[in-house]
Regions:
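N-terminal secretory signal peptides that target proteins for export/translocation
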Residues: 1-3
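Bacterial N-terminal signal peptides
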Residues: 8-18
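Boundary at the C-terminal end of the N-terminal hydrophobic targeting segment
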Residues: 19-25
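Short, charge-rich binding segments
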Residues: 23, 101-104, 132-133
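Exported/periplasmic ABC-transporter solute-binding proteins
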Residues: 25-58, 62, 67, 71-77, ...
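Acidic, polar ligand-binding/catalytic clefts
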Residues: 80-106
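Residue-level signal for tight coil/turn positions that link beta-strands
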Residues: 106-108, 137
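Serine endopeptidase catalytic core focused on the charge-relay Asp
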Residues: 111
Length: 277
């Protein structure tokens, strides 16, 4: 009889550990690979509990630079990828690592600079502003870390007609770190820096920094979501991952994105196109 009670207790413990139908907690979890700026914005802390309450699916987040996100995903380290580096995303799909990408939301980049504005760029378009900064040799902080934001910045220098790779002088300063570190470096050096708006809104110790350029259409920062290709990665949790993708681009998920605010300001703007690829 005692042995039977022990067996029943053991079975109950197994049931608690594995849940219904023998499924472990990990079987109801997916891995989402995303960028550090997305994680630091606080958006996922807002979205993921809503998704878990709706579906019972846990989402484990890996936050890295955009290039590291894709490198890890190519090794099968994620079920779903959420980043903001569209050219790289489209190549990722073309190479067969994901079957499709979907627009999810956007925010924008802003050029941050000292309130004293030594390069006199406030209110200019982004190309004119960057030309003025380079011409003046005004201090500019770059993340220099191969992130999505760094890639966007490099593309903007090209738009401005400046070969930033051969830039001379101490005015162009690499931090090789994330957005918060770059903003802090700009604050300390009284320098210009390109930031996604969400990171700027969340950055508290601004000192003498302020937005000097915004609203240029070339500063759009589009986010895409991709389910890893189960034909290439058999261990991908296809059904659970697809459930997350479907929820993000659904009216409910889009409303949750729109509902995330910091200090009363909306950080991300949903724009899912379910037919996009």
């Amino acid at each position: 009889m005692a042995a039977r009670r022990l067996f029943v207790a053991f079975a109950l413990l197994c049931g608690l550990a594995w849940g219904p139908e023998g499924a472990s907690a990990d079987d109801r979890a997916i891995v989402l690979a995303t960028t550090t700026s997305t994680q630091e914005s606080g958006l996922l802390d807002h979205l993921l509990p809503i998704f878990r309450d709706k579906t019972g699916i846990d989402v484990k987040v890996i936050a890295r630079r955009a290039d590291e996100v894709l490198d890890g995903a190519r090794k099968g380290e994620a079920d779903v990828v959420l980043i903001h580096a569209r050219p790289q995303e489209e190549k990722f799909v073309a190479d067969g690592f994901a079957a499709k990408r979907f627009d999810v939301m956007y925010n924008d980049y802003v050029l941050i600079g000292p309130k004293s504005d030594p390069a006199a760029v406030k209110g200019k378009d982004i190309a004119t502003a960057l030309k003025a900064i380079e011409g003046k040799g005004a201090p500019f902080v770059t993340r220099g870390d191969r992130s999505g934001t760094h890639a966007a910045e490099l593309a903007l220098w090209i738009v401005a007609g400046i070969d930033i790779a051969s830039a001379k002088g101490a005015w162009y300063r690499e931090v090789k770190q994330g957005m918060d570190a770059a903003l802090e470096a700009a604050r300390t050096a009284n320098a210009y820096v390109l930031s996604d708006r969400g990171s700027w809104i969340s950055f508290r110790d601004r000192g003498e920094l302020d937005i000097v350029v915004e609203g240029d259409k070339r500063l759009l920062n589009q986010y895409g979501v991709m389910l890893m290709n189960p034909e290439k990665f058999p261990n991908v949790k296809k059904e659970l991952g697809q459930t997350f993708v479907d929820w993000l681009i659904s009216p409910e998920g889009q409303a949750a994105i729109a509902g995330y605010k910091v200090d009363g300001q909306q950080l991300f703007f949903p724009n899912a196109d379910k037919s996009a690829g």
